[in-house]
């Protein structure tokens, strides 16, 4: 009997050892498959990151990993079940054979416990391998391939965003467009404002005008997006009626003409001084000759219909303005020491207040090109437009405040309406600033022409129609009426009619003004240039032109008409305090603008 039990127990031990060895081999296979899966996943991810494949490869890797996870989970479940069955069998076998041989049973128990520990460790390793497989695959928005750069591009740091190349229609390029639209001839009259009003009152008016410019620019940009039109006149026509469009067309046209005249006066004065100092022929010191020469150089640039072609010139304009501020700042102390009366005014109120108010209002007038820039914007969302307008206004405040304070402390109460005229002609650094400013104002003309071209075209069509009506009224009883009817029938399809794309969405970068015929643009540019050149040869006083002409256009375009647009859409603003405070502010600036024009005109007459 003992022999039988001994042989049976030995056979049982041999079978159990075989099972244990088989289980170990299975666990080794599981671990090796897990490690192979891990290595394969790592290699896949590394290859994906190196080659920058499309986003589909990432999702395929994720699916493959998920399948591997489920497969390994099933294997782990099977191994756990086998462990339980084997443990139950081993416990039963040890209980039945304890009376036969205690030493062998103790050895079996210790072996079973050690096997269980090893199996648990192996299962933990498999689970950790699966977890590692999950963390290796990167499905976040950190890195993207070239196919995804347009939509889900990772954010770069501020250095990469600031010093990277300008993209047409981007936030930075649109900010530069707003700044170059606003900073014009009025920039040189800021120290004159400080000398007449004092430092504190001038800074207060700068902040108030900056806030008004920010609010009205946002009103125009958001209204252009909502009504899907990027021409100022068409926006007012949709909101109001055709008479509103005529008013804004006149305002934009008059504003461009007045700024064009001022720029021709300034550039001719600057260049004549430079040519005189460097002993050029007397022909180049003649203002009339210089005005004609400048107009001939400006004309070809105004024929362009895309803002992107002017990006490099506009960036150079900001550079030249910065050089001018630095040059005047470095010479402030030396010129201040030459003054006899060094009394500094902090707050001053006199008859010059209204003219200075209009100069500052004109200096922040970036609204004429607001709709046009919105049409040129790439992905014109409210957040991106708000960011661009806010940055442009902040930079204008910094420029005007620094330039006004530095120019005022250089000459105090003797500052002229054009601060550059206070410097002697022998100052080489100021001559360099004059040349840089001439280039800045030169390239601002085609930019402003792009924004006001549609208005001048529409105003020309309105004038032509009025002349046709007058013609029919005078000759309606004569035989000329029949010829006129034939003439009018040829214009049923108006060749000058403005064409604009109605299918432009919020994410479109196509402007309505880009579809016009090139010949119309050339004719209007030539006619307006000749008209401005004739006036520029006669007018010399700068501040009076800004105070009257700039005051009318700035008040009309920057205050009154945005106020009308905001009043039409006032129900879209749920907060009543914000609604009525904005209306009050716009009404106040509209009233002050027109009052300043009247007072400035009366001061000149009387």
Swiss-Prot record:
The keyword Repressor does not apply. Disulfide bonds: none annotated. Its main location: membrane. One of its GO terms (biological process) is amino acid transmembrane transport. Residues 140-149 have a biased composition (Acidic residues). GO terms for molecular function: amino acid transmembrane transporter activity; L-arginine transmembrane transporter activity; L-glutamate transmembrane transporter activity; L-histidine transmembrane transporter activity; L-lysine transmembrane transporter activity; L-serine transmembrane transporter activity; L-tyrosine transmembrane transporter activity. Keywords: Amino-acid transport, Membrane, Transmembrane, Transmembrane helix, Transport, Vacuole. Changing residue 313 to S: Might play a role in the evolution of resistance to quinoline drugs in southeast Asia, moderately reduces parasite fitness and moderately increases resistance to chloroquine. The keyword Transmembrane applies. It is found in: Vacuole membrane. The chain crosses the membrane at residues 175-194, 200-225, 246-271, 283-301, 313-332, 352-372, 393-412, 428-449, 522-539, 545-567, 579-605. Residues 12-25, 72-89 have a biased composition (Basic and acidic residues). Belongs to the amino acid/polyamine transporter 2 family. Putative amino acid transporter. Probably transports tryptophan. Involved in maintaining the osmotic homeostasis of the digestive vacuole. Important for the timely development and growth of the asexual-stage parasites and male gametocyte maturation. This is Putative amino acid transporter AAT1. The gene is AAT1.
């Amino acid at each position: 009997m003992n022999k039988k039990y001994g042989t049976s127990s030995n056979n049982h031990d041999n079978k159990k050892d075989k099972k244990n060895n088989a289980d170990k081999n299975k666990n080794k296979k599981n671990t090796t498959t897990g490690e192979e899966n891990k290595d394969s996943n790592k290699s896949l991810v590394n290859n994906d990151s190196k080659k920058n494949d499309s986003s589909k490869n990432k999702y395929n890797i994720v699916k493959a990993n998920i399948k591997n996870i489920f497969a390994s989970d099933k294997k782990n479940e099977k191994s756990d079940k086998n462990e339980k069955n084997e443990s139950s069998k081993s416990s039963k076998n040890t209980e039945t054979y304890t009376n036969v041989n205690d030493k062998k049973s103790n050895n079996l128990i210790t072996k079973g416990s050690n096997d269980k520990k090893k199996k648990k460790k192996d299962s933990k390793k498999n689970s950790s391998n699966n977890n590692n497989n999950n963390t290796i695959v990167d499905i976040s928005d950190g890195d993207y391939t070239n196919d995804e750069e347009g939509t889900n591009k990772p954010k770069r740091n501020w250095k990469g965003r600031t010093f990277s190349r300008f993209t047409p229609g981007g936030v930075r390029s649109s900010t530069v467009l707003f700044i170059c639209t606003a900073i014009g001839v009025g920039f040189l009259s800021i120290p004159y404002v400080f000398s007449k009003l004092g430092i504190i009152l001038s800074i207060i008016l700068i902040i108030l005008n900056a806030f008004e410019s920010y609010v009205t620019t946002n009103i125009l940009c958001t209204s252009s997006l909502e009504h899907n039109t990027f021409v100022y006149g068409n926006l007012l026509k949709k909101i109001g009626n055709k008479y509103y469009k005529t008013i804004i067309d006149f305002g934009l046209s008059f504003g461009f003409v007045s700024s064009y005249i001022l720029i021709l006066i300034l550039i001719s004065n600057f260049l004549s001084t430079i040519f005189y100092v460097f002993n050029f022929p007397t022909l180049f010191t003649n203002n009339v000759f210089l005005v004609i020469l400048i107009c001939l150089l400006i004309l070809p640039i105004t024929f362009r219909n895309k803002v992107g072609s002017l990006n490099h010139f506009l960036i150079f304009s900001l550079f030249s303005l910065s050089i001018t501020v630095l040059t005047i700042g470095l010479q402030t102390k030396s010129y201040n020491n030459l003054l006899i009366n060094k009394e500094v005014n902090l707050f001053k109120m006199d008859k010059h207040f209204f003219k200075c108010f209009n100069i500052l209002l004109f200096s922040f007038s970036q609204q004429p090109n607001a709709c046009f820039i919105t049409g040129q914007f790439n992905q014109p969302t409210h957040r991106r437009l708000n960011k661009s307008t806010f940055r442009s206004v902040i930079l204008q405040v910094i420029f005007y405040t620094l330039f006004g304070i530095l120019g005022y402390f250089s000459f105090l109460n003797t500052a002229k309406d054009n601060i550059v005229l206070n410097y002697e002609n022998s100052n080489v650094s100021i001559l360099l600033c004059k040349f840089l400013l001439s280039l800045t104002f030169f390239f601002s003309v085609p930019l402003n022409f792009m924004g006001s071209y549609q208005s001048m075209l529409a105003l020309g069509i309105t004038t032509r129609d009025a002349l046709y009506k007058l013609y029919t009224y005078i000759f309606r009883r004569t035989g000329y009426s029949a010829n006129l009817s034939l003439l009018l029938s040829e214009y049923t399809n108006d060749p000058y009619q403005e064409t604009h794309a109605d299918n432009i969405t919020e994410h479109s970068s196509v402007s309505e003004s880009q579809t016009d015929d090139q010949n119309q643009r050339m004719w209007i540019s030539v006619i307006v240039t000749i008209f401005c050149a004739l006036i520029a040869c006669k007018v010399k006083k700068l501040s009076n032109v800004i105070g009257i002409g700039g005051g009318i256009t700035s008040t009309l375009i920057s205050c009154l008409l945005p106020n009308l647009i905001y009043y039409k859409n006032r129900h879209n603003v749920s907060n009543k305090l914000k609604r009525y405070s904005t209306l009050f502010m716009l009404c106040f600036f509209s009233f002050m603008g027109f009052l300043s024009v009247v007072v400035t005109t009366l001061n000149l007459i009387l």
